[in-house]
From Swiss-Prot:
Gene Ontology CC annotations of this record: bacterial-type flagellum; extracellular region
Function per UniProt: Flagellin is the subunit protein which polymerizes to form the filaments of bacterial flagella. FlaB/D is not essential for polar flagellar synthesis and swimming motility. Homomer of FlaB/D is not able to form a functional filament.
Protein family: Belongs to the bacterial flagellin family.
GO MF annotations, alphabetized: structural molecule activity
Phosphoprotein recorded as keyword: no
Keywords assigned by UniProt, alphabetized: Bacterial flagellum, Coiled coil, Secreted
Subunit structure: Heteromer of multiple flagellin subunits including FlaA, FlaB/D, FlaC, FlaE and FlaF.
Gene3D superfamilies, A to Z: 2.60.40.4390, 6.10.280.190, f41 fragment of flagellin, N-terminal domain (1.20.1330.10), Flagellar export chaperone, C-terminal domain (6.10.10.10)
Protein name: Polar flagellin B/D
Coiled-coil residue windows: 103-128, 311-340
Organism: Vibrio parahaemolyticus serotype O3:K6 (strain RIMD 2210633)
Primary gene name: flaB
């Protein structure tokens, strides 16, 4: 082996390995202190790009879960208020049935009407004041709004909150009253016992209800027979013996037409009026009877929307479960790419520390090699 002074190859080699060991040690310390094995693009360019995309997705999923929970909270708030609306309507129905009883005097019916009016005011107050985050929910101003329940655009679900005020047309319908009142001596005549009711239902289908009453039936029995043949309209009789037919706006679209022998004899079709829970009047037998049909239509409308809100809440609960599952898997994938394996990294750091110490020792010895040339000069 040649002995030279100008170039110490052994020292250069030891220096190179020392630098490598120190660099590896610094990398291990950075990974252990940060908790990430990718701290810059130079560590793993592709891994950094993938982990950043996964991080964006994870953050979006977190926001989506919060949005879905807000949607559930809004639905719960609205549904809770509507539960009280249902209770009020049921009480109003009880009072209407009570007022329809023949044992009540005019004064008693007026007293019942006072409670009905107070309940109606409270129903409207609930609709006007129920809110979430300053947004009114049940007075018809909320409408349909979208809830972002995904990590990307285009993953929204619509929620519509309907008007629960008592003057909303869906909280009532149209009342048709016969022009001619029939007393207890009136009976359905043979040959004039047919009544055809033509209408369009809420699904847009044209319907014809053919009533063939039994000859000899009185006006109350006729109303009972009509109610037994269909649930699209409700028939009742007022205190003057006039037949009343109510068509709820939640069941019937547009006008109802009447034809047949009974239609002509009773004078059905010309006298009609729009009625809602806000207009019910139980101070008369006819008004009380009609009020029952109006409130039944309102209850169906409210309960139908409550069912929609219940389905919305269940859907969002499942959406949250799915989002949590996706987020868990996304974070697991990101962790495998970016997070430090402490067991592996501490082993690597120990190795680099040992190599650094060994390289330092060898470098010190390599630096002494040129001194051997002095002994040759004697």
């Amino acid at each position: 082996m040649a002995v030279n002074v100008n170039t110490n190859v052994s020292a250069m080699t030891a220096q190179r390995y020392l630098n490598n060991a120190n660099s590896a040690q610094q990398t291990s310390m950075e990974r252990l202190s940060s908790g990430f094995k990718i701290n810059s693009a130079k560590d793993d360019a592709a891994g950094l790009q993938i982990s950043n995309r996964l991080n964006v997705q994870s953050r979006g999923l977190d926001v989506a879960v919060r949005n879905a929970n807000d949607g559930i909270s809004i639905a719960q708030t609205a549904e809770g208020a509507m539960n009280e609306t249902t209770n009020i309507l049921q009480r109003m129905r009880d009072l209407s049935l009570q007022s329809a009883n023949g044992s009540n005097s005019k004064a008693e019916r007026v007293a019942i009407q006072e409670e009905v009016t107070a309940l109606n005011d409270e129903l409207n107050r609930i609709a006007e004041t129920t809110s979430f985050g300053g947004n009114k929910l049940l007075n018809g101003t909320h409408g349909a709004k979208s809830f972002q329940i995904g990590a990307d655009n285009g993953e929204a679900v619509m929620l519509e909150l309907k008007d629960m005020r008592s003057d909303n047309k869906m909280m009532g319908g149209v009342s048709y009253q016969a022009e001619s009142g029939k007393g207890k001596d009136w009976n359905v005549a043979q040959g004039k016992n047919d009544l055809k009711i033509s209408l369009t239902d809420s699904f847009g289908q044209e319907q014809e209800i053919n009533i063939n009453a039994k000859a000899g039936d009185d006006i109350e029995e006729l109303a009972t027979y009509i109610n037994g043949q269909t649930d699209l309209v409700k028939a009742s009789v007022d205190q003057d013996g006039k037949l009343q037919i109510f068509a709820g706006n939640n069941k019937v679209e547009g006008e109802v037409s009447f034809s047949g022998g009974l239609s002509g004899e009773l004078g059905l079709g010309d006298d009609k009026k729009n009625v809602t829970v806000d207009t019910i009047d139980v101070t008369s037998v006819g008004g009380a009877q009609e009020s029952v049909a109006i409130i039944d239509a309102a209850l169906k409308y409210v309960d139908s929307h409550r069912a929609e809100l219940g389905a919305f809440q269940n859907r969002f609960n499942h959406a949250i479960s799915n989002l949590d599952n996706i987020n868990e898997n996304v974070n697991a994938s990101k962790s495998r790419i970016k997070d430090t394996d402490f067991a592996k990294e501490t082993t690597a750091m120990t190795k680099s520390q040992i190599l650094s110490q060994a390289s330092s020792s060898i470098l010190a010895q390599a630096k002494q090699a040129p001194n051997s040339a002095l002994s040759l000069l004697g």
